[in-house]
């Protein structure tokens, strides 16, 4: 049985991790433990690079907190231009898989608050009247009227981040390049 460390205690993120590991390894083949670790980036990361660093840092910190595990999973949501998205980082032994989620264009009323230093989740709570939005369906759930959720979008990206660990082509050595 695999021991999976989720570098989060957010239920929406843990549900996405559960769905992805169910799909790839099967229900009952792993156990997930959520740990609260720092991302090392601002609460609302701006740009793909900063967001990816946050996901990688979560994995690094989770490995320090729980070094005896099989997988470590970090998810960090961010904003780039007028889009929200997230980076998924999964490490297993000495290998890493990464994927970026689908993006959602945000309305100007939300972006204005973000430019003033507020988090997307806080802006969504004010505008929707739903507290703790980011631990539920997220902005994605509100804007798609539940057709997609934070969990469903992260689930898809996590499946992609898991590919290097179960697809045998990733395990093959690279052929050496011919001399020029």
From Swiss-Prot:
Keyword Magnesium tagged: yes
UniProt catalytic activity: XTP + H2O = XDP + phosphate + H(+); ITP + H2O = IDP + phosphate + H(+)
Key word Cytoplasm present: no
Needed co-factor(s): Mg(2+); Mn(2+)
Cofactor binding remark: Binds 1 divalent metal cation per subunit; can use either Mg(2+) or Mn(2+).
EC assignment: 3.6.1.73
GO biological process, one term: nucleotide metabolic process
Binding site for Mg(2+): 38
Keywords: Hydrolase, Magnesium, Manganese, Metal-binding, Nucleotide metabolism, Nucleotide-binding
InterPro entries, per database record: ITPase-like_fam, Non_canon_purine_NTPase, NTPase/PRRC1, YjjX_NTPase
Residues annotated for substrate binding in this entry: 8-13
Protein purpose: Phosphatase that hydrolyzes non-canonical purine nucleotides such as XTP and ITP to their respective diphosphate derivatives. Probably excludes non-canonical purines from DNA/RNA precursor pool, thus preventing their incorporation into DNA/RNA and avoiding chromosomal lesions.
Similarity remark: Belongs to the YjjX NTPase family.
Quaternary state and interactors: Homodimer.
Protein name per the record: Inosine/xanthosine triphosphatase
Organism (species): Yersinia pseudotuberculosis serotype O:1b (strain IP 31758)
């Amino acid at each position: 049985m695999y021991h999976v460390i989720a570098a989060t205690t957010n239920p929406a993120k843990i549900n996405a991790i559960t769905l992805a590991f169910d799909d790839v390894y099967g229900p009952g083949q792993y156990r997930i433990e959520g740990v609260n670790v720092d991302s090392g980036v601002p609460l609302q990361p701006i740009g793909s690079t900063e967001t990816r660093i946050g996901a990688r840092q979560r994995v690094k910190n989770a490995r320090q907190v729980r070094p005896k595990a099989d997988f470590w999973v970090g998810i960090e949501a961010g904003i780039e231009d007028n889009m929200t998205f997230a980076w998924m980082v999964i490490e297993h032994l000495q290998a890493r898989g990464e994927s970026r989620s689908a993006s959602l264009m945000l309305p100007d009323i939300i972006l204005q608050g973000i430019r003033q230093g507020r988090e997307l989740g806080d802006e969504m709570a004010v505008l929707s009247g739903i507290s703790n939005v980011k631990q539920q369906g997220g902005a994605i759930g509100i804007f798609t009227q539940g057709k997609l959720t934070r969990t469903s979008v992260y689930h898809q990206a996590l499946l992609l981040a898991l590919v290097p660990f179960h697809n045998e082509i990733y395990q093959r050595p690279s052929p050496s390049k011919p001399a020029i």
